[in-house]
Amino acid sequence: LPQYRGAAPINWAVINGERLTGVTTFMIDKDIDTGGIMLRQDCRIEPDDTAGDIHDKLMPIGAQLVVETVQGIIERNIETRVQRSFIQGSEVLKPAPKLTRELCHIDWNDTTKNVYNLIRGLSPYPTAFTELVPEGEETKAPAQLKVFATEKVEGEEFRSMLEHIGKDNVTPGTILSDGKGFFAIATADGAISIKDMQLAGKKRMEVKAFLAGFRNPMSWTTTAGTSKAEMEKARPASNTEE
């Protein structure tokens, strides 16, 4: 605090590509997460950390901070500072609203970086997903594919992937796969290679095991997602802190 007030601060910090998060102890007041701050402890977010990883990192930090806060209250040597005093200049406060199904449904028209961070921020729960349908049969009920772990495919690596499968150019949402070792989906400026996934009705598995039972992957396509619009809703236009 004061950043990421709301229901899902860990998730949104990862979704937004932050490099630093932390734990805060604070006083309760009439509004949500706005009370005076007592203690704060930082925690680094590594480039491949998921929300689950950060949760596990923060647990021992939070436990120790609670002990220190209680001791400070008992000994009456802890100060409380208003949250406004932690805001630097024109710094914008980012919210952490409830995670919705619309946020979890991946919009492949977004950038590789944004999709990668979205998937990390929703893993392992509630989990980002895409919907698959056979090409030319878009009226059929789609199959949901949950996505737990990925890698970014950008620049020369992306061009090499296209060359490997005999493509010159692709539209966002196009499935790219050799049917054996990789399963990727094109974004606005590259692709996301999916490493750990779960098809509806199946167990969670890694890519090679998935492809062993998912024939002709490039004969499928994805449905339109909603995550990009949901992320835009959560992006503050200005600092509304008074």
Model-derived regions, located:
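Internal anion-binding site segments
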Residues: 88-242
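Donor/substrate-binding cores of folate-linked one-carbon enzymes
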Residues: 1-95
